[in-house]
Every structure is written in C-alpha cells, then in structure tokens.
C-alpha cells in the first residue's frame, strides 16, 4: 500500500513524499 503526503522541503516549498505501508 502506497500513500503520498505533502511535506515542507528545506527550501520551504511543499514536496511529495511517498511512503510504503507494508
């Protein structure tokens, strides 16, 4: 199961991070 979340990057811009839920 994969889900993506929006997190703040080091530059302050939102980045998509993919996490694997096994």
UniProtKB/Swiss-Prot annotation:
Signal peptide: none annotated. It catalyses: Hydrolysis of proteins and small molecule substrates at -Asn-|-Xaa- bonds. It comes from the Eukaryota. Transmembrane segments: none annotated. Its EC number is 3.4.22.34. Disulfide bonds: none annotated. It is an enzyme of class 3 (hydrolase). Keywords: Hydrolase, Protease, Thiol protease. One of its GO terms (molecular function) is cysteine-type endopeptidase activity. GO terms for biological process: proteolysis. Belongs to the peptidase C13 family. This is Hemoglobinase-like protein 2. It comes from Fasciola hepatica (Liver fluke). The lineage of its organism: Eukaryota, Metazoa, Spiralia, Lophotrochozoa, Platyhelminthes.
């Amino acid at each position: 199961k994969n889900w993506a979340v929006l997190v703040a990057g080091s530059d302050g811009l939102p980045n998509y991070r993919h996490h694997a839920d096994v």
